[in-house]
């Protein structure tokens, strides 16, 4: 998506106009304009020149943002800072101060002496023409100061795309023109000596309304501008963390350079108390690094040689020498800024209603204002009265509140997520996450730590735990198996010395054999150990119990004598059960997907407390499972992104957990920087809060106009005598957008991890509908040889789906696999026989 800066927009009507203009350009497939950040995202093949020309022809300005791929982090960050810099507020403050200084004497001359009896200078006493001329000049001065409304308003009207400025300009101009007419008419009456007419025309002056409308709208726009600036505070705080310089090591000397001069592969140093300038890997030194700026985790992370560090994180204690691995726009910080900015430039589906209304809002208001004037004139009221009602309609109507209702909440919500290490890639993902009904959790790396650990040491009679661990350590040190690494980690933690072994041999599917001090050392599963030693009944019972708990028992013997048993398991994360419980309390069904066997899977599922367990699912089969779950409701798939890409893409919302510094996971809609499962309910909680805030904003924006426009038009005058002065209408308009933005800012007070106020959604999915497991496992993956083309795929698919109990089969001749989804137990032999009857070879079924 190409990003552009857009200038000249003042309200939702402008935004809609720009979108329509760019969408008509040949080659443009999608266009999203953000009124909040004055930016535009465009997808398609159209050239930048064509897009910019379309925007300019619509009456606005556009320029392309910095080219992607720049190696300058400072340049890219500076561009974002420039984009988010509050340029409007200082200008509006000057305009407002000047307008108020002129408005005070104008109000004094127009109303002070009549309403409160304030004295006038003697020159003006009885000099009605002088009074009118002073008001005329003061009003012209205020109009010149606020000329932006007239330039923008009439320019957009000329382009047949009236906006909020058009309403203000028309209202102020109508008041001014009618007042000028009244001044000339009064002057004529004065010349003719008709004092009754003079007094009558004096009361027809609306100069103060023309000036007051402009001043009050400026007040509102300034308040809105200040509030809008606060919606990007989270991004601004991140940008401030970006270092401007780095200390490089060149020819053994320390050289301080600008951050834009750092290149990949450069060596740099970071002293205690300094921010790390770019992403890199530690070469020398140890330290504690505070990564809260990126992940929201307040506890410092220990770093040593080989560990990765990220730009903008704080080196708290040690002296580090690092090698730059990511610079410029590739750093984690730049990617976070880019992601939040891109999300702000996209449209949430809920915004479509406001966009449709905004497209016709201003023309409709102008028509209502004209109709109001005509109706009151036909009703016998004076021109001044009818004009006041029409002007009130123009100045009270506010398309800005509608246009800002969604983007300000999206921006604040995204900022909140960014501060806590939760990245929503688009406004769509921020909206859809809160509508989740089913959460599918990949077991490894999501519910569990993803790294097997030793959970139990069970020595045989007469053997100590240390002797058992020493024997296992000696045997496993030459193995690359993940279970072996768990034993090695425990042995090293306990400081055990390495013992050399000889004649090492790995027995695939069974275990390991070697010699230590001339004695045969064996380790592995029950099938191997029963051939080497006598396994006691007590140890067999303990092994069965450990297996039921989801642990893998490894047996060890030496020269026919049992040393004991070590249980290894991929243990669940500390916060997983709490996170699952929080999801369930929110009315969400939780499903665990794993390739483990049924017994191990159910043991882990029971510990985590999930609603359903789907076992025997290999990576290729996850996508099919997600497709089935989507038939039941809105599905969020949570995985570590390593082998979950198809499933993450297939789900309604893909959530990548534990991304750390690698946040550019294309398959995911939401990226969680930390490995905490509790961030999943927190993300859903934030999405729901943001949606709720958007609904509130839209409600107040609509209700304001629904109530305000009839009141301004004088609908209630015949019944209750309620009449709205144009100045009060302008005041109401000026506050409407401010109120919407202020309401969105309340999201900054929202606590993402506070589960005490969670509301349970009404989830119509019966629990049994999620029960997709069978004794054989719900999904089986077949490895098939001989398939050469799409015709082969279709043939195998048809054969498998003809078998009773097979719901569907996803076949790929390129991968040589068939992922079979079952609704009832089907034996492997039945599947194999059916496929091989078609002259293909089944190499395996899992």
Residue ranges and their predicted role:
Residues 1-130, 228, 253-254, 338-346, ...:
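Flexible metal-binding regulatory segments at protein termini and peripheral loops
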Residues 16, 346, 424, 436, ...:
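Conserved ATP-binding TGD loop and adjacent catalytic N/P-domain core of P-type ATPases
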Residues 26-43, 204-205, 236-330, 428-472, ...:
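Conserved cytosolic catalytic loops of P-type ATPases
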Residues 91-245, 356, 721-726, 732:
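Transmembrane helix-loop-helix hairpins at the membrane interface
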Residues 92-94, 313, 437-480, 510-591, ...:
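ATP-driven catalytic headpiece of P-type ATPases
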Residues 186, 194-197, 211-272, 303, ...:
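Juxtamembrane coupling segments of multi-pass membrane pumps/enzymes
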Residues 294, 353, 388, 401-475, ...:
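Conserved catalytic phosphorylation-site environment of P-type ATPases
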């Amino acid at each position: 998506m190409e990003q552009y800066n857009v200038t000249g927009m003042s309200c939702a009507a402008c935004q809609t106009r720009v979108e329509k203009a760019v969408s008509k350009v040949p080659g443009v497939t999608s266009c999203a304009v953000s009124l909040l950040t004055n930016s535009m995202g465009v997808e398609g093949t159209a050239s930048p020149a064509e897009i910019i020309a379309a925007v300019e022809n619509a009456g606005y300005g556009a320029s392309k943002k910095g080219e992607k791929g720049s190696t300058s982090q400072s340049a890219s960050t500076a561009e974002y800072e420039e984009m988010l810099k509050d340029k409007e507020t200082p200008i509006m403050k000057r305009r407002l101060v000047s307008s108020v200084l002129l408005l005070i004497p104008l109000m004094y001359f127009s109303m002070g002496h009549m309403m409160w009896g304030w004295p006038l200078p003697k020159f003006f006493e009885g000099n009605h023409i002088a009074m009118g001329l002073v008001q005329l000049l003061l009003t012209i001065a205020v109009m010149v100061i606020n000329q932006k409304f007239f330039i923008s308003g009439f320019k957009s009207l000329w382009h047949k795309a009236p906006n909020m400025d058009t309403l203000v300009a028309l209202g102020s101009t109508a008041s001014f023109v009618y007042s000028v007419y009244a001044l000339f008419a009064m002057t004529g009456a004065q010349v003719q000596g008709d004092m009754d007419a003079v007094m009558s025309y004096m009361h027809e002056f609306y100069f103060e309304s023309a000036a007051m409308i402009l001043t009050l709208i400026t007040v509102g726009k300034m308040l809105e501008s200040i509030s809008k600036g606060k919606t990007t505070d989270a991004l601004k705080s991140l940008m401030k963390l970006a270092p401007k310089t780095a200390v490089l090591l060149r020819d053994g000397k320390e050289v301080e350079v600008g951050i834009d001069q750092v290149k990949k592969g450069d060596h740099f140093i970071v002293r205690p108390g300094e921010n790390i300038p770019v992403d890199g890997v530690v070469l020398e030194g140890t330290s504690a690094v505070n990564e809260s700026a990126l992940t929201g985790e307040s506890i410092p992370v220990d770093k040593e040689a080989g560990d990765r560090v990220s730009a903008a994180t704080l080196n708290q204690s040690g002296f580090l020498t690092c090698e730059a691995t990511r610079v410029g726009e590739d750093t984690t910080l730049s990617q976070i800024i880019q992601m939040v900015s891109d999300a702000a430039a996209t449209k949430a589906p809920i915004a479509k209603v406001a966009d449709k209304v905004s497209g016709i809002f201003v023309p409709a208001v102008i028509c209502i204002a004209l109709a109001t004037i005509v109706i009151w004139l036909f009703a016998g009221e004076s021109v001044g009265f009818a004009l006041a009602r029409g002007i009130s309609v123009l100045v009270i109507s506010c398309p800005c509140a509608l246009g800002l209702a969604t983007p300000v909440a999206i921006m604040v919500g995204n900022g909140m997520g960014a501060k806590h290490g939760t990245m929503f890639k688009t406004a769509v993902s921020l909206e859809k996450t809160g509508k989740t009904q089913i959460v599918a959790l990949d077991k490894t790396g999501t519910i569990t730590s993803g790294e097997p650990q030793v959970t139990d040491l069970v020595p045989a009679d007469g053997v100590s735990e240390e002797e058992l661990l020493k024997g296992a350590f000696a045997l496993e040190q030459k193995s690359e198996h993940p279970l072996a690494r768990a034993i090695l980690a425990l042995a090293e933690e306990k400081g055990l010395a390495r013992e050399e072994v000889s004649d090492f041999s790995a027995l695939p599917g069974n275990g390991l054999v070697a010699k230590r001090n001339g004695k045969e050392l064996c380790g592995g599963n029950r099938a191997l150990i029963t051939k080497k030693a006598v396994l006691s009944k007590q140890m067999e019972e303990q092994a069965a119990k450990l297996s039921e708990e989801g642990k893998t028992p490894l047996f060890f013997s030496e020269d026919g004598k049992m040393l004991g048993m070590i249980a290894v398991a991929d243990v669940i994360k500390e916060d997983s059960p709490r996170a699952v419980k929080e999801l369930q309390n929110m009315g969400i069904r939780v499903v665990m997907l794993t390739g483990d066997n049924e017994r191990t899977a159910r043991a882990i599922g029971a510990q985590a407390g999930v609603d359903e367990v789907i076992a025997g699912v290999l990576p290729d089969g996850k996508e099919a499972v997600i497709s089935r779950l989507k038939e039941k409701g809105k599905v969020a798939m949570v995985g570590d992104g390593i082998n979950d890409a198809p499933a993450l893409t297939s789900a309604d919302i893909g959530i990548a957990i534990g991304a750390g510094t690698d946040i550019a996971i294309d398959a995911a809609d939401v990226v969680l920087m930390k490995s905490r499962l509790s961030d999943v309910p927190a993300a859903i909680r934030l999405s729901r809060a943001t949606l709720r805030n958007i609904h509130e904003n839209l409600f107040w924006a609509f209700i304001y106009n629904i109530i305000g426009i009839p009141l301004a038009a004088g609908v209630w005058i015949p019944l209750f005598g309620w009449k709205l002065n144009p100045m009060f209408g302008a005041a109401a308009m000026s506050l409407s957008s401010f109120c919407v933005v202020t309401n969105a800012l309340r999201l900054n007070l929202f606590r993402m991890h506070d589960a005490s106020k969670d509301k349970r959604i009404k989830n119509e999915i019966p629990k049994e509908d999620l029960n997709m497991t069978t004794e054989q496992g719900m999904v089986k993956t077949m490895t098939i040889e001989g398939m050469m083309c799409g015709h082969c795929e279709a043939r195998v698919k048809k054969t498998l789906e003809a078998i009773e109990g097979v719901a569907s089969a996803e076949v790929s001749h390129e991968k040589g696999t068939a992922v079979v989804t079952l609704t009832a137990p089907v034996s492997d032999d039945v599947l194999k026989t059916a496929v091989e009857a078609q002259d293909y070879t089944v190499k395996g079924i899992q």
